[in-house]
Amino acid sequence: MYGIEYTTILTXLISLIFITYILKSITRTMDFIIYRFLFVIVVLAPFVKTQNYGINLPITGSMDTPYMNSTMSETFLTSTLCLYYPHEAATQIADDKWKDTLSQLFLTKGWSTGSVYFKEYTDIASFSVDPQLYCDYNIVLMKYDGNSQLDMSELADLILNEWLCNPMDITLYYYQQTDEANKWISMGNSCTIKVCPLNTQTLGIGCLTTDPTTFEEVASAEKLVITDVVDGVNHKLDVTTATCTIRNCKKLGPRENVAVIQVGGSNILDITADPTTAPQTERMMRINWKKWWQVFYTIVDYVNQIVQVMSKRSRSLNSAAFYYRI
């Protein structure tokens, strides 16, 4: 009986020693592989140029989408520039090769061929409905029109700032603006906005909540409306939802990779005169109106000075990411 017990103990000890030896062998083998792999990486690293391709993750609910796709810092050699211009510019120039000509001229200022993109829009109103600013630097040309000053100033406020927005269900809820940065932004083919301020008993102040015809009209048949009401007061809203979408937005701060250039007009539209807008006149500029060729020549000549007052950002404006927030 004792012999059997001794044999069992001896077998267990031998098994334990054997397992320990195997584990040590595996450990030595893994160490050899890991160290050899790290050695190869260290040797090859100086000869390999890598680039970080970030994942395109839209911030749904914000009009801003992150784009990170650069490990270089040279401003012009690796940056993209978008130039937005009205349709009338191409019509007046009437030259199929005019973009190629400008690309060659931008090359003399350090902007490589293929880094400058020309984006055409029909008019200020249509551009307001779906502005998309994708480049590292974005310059928007707006031809001055005395009848469109409000549209121009609201568009400038929209694209020169970053906004975080949520959808609004005006059929079920009342809404209030909490502070100066809180605005309601409406976009669509035709936006008519009416509001009815409410007292603490949710009764209309100067209006009937059940009768939209008694509401106060703050915008009529516009494509872009930035509505500002009295902070801290609930409001019942009436909006032409069939042709317009309204959102509750918070101004996050300046969008520093965008500049607006007013073409013509006796004075520049100063959106900083609006008490809801922080001073940012450096990125709101004006050039004299002559002919569109002259306008573009001026832009090319001063493009680097214009870019100097901007900041390259990793955010682009896309109204498609503007609708919902997770």
From Swiss-Prot:
Region (CNP motif): 165-167
Entry's family note: Belongs to the rotavirus VP7 family.
Misc note: Some rotavirus strains are neuraminidase-sensitive and require sialic acid to attach to the cell surface. Some rotavirus strains are integrin-dependent. Some rotavirus strains depend on ganglioside for their entry into the host cell. Hsp70 also seems to be involved in the entry of some strains. In group A rotaviruses, VP7 defines the G serotype.
Binding site for Ca(2+) 2: 177, 228-229, 231, 301
Organism: Rotavirus A (strain RVA/Pig/Mexico/YM/1983/G11P9[7])
One cellular component term from this protein's GO annotations in UniProt: viral outer capsid
Secretion signal span: 1-50
Post-translational modification: N-glycosylated.
Stretches the record annotates as GPR motif: 253-255
Protein known as: Outer capsid glycoprotein VP7
The UniProt record lists the keyword Magnesium: no
Superkingdom, natural source: Viruses
Compartment(s): Virion; Host endoplasmic reticulum lumen
General function of this protein: Calcium-binding protein that interacts with rotavirus cell receptors once the initial attachment by VP4 has been achieved. Rotavirus attachment and entry into the host cell probably involves multiple sequential contacts between the outer capsid proteins VP4 and VP7, and the cell receptors. Following entry into the host cell, low intracellular or intravesicular Ca(2+) concentration probably causes the calcium-stabilized VP7 trimers to dissociate from the virion. This step is probably necessary for the membrane-disrupting entry step and the release of VP4, which is locked onto the virion by VP7.
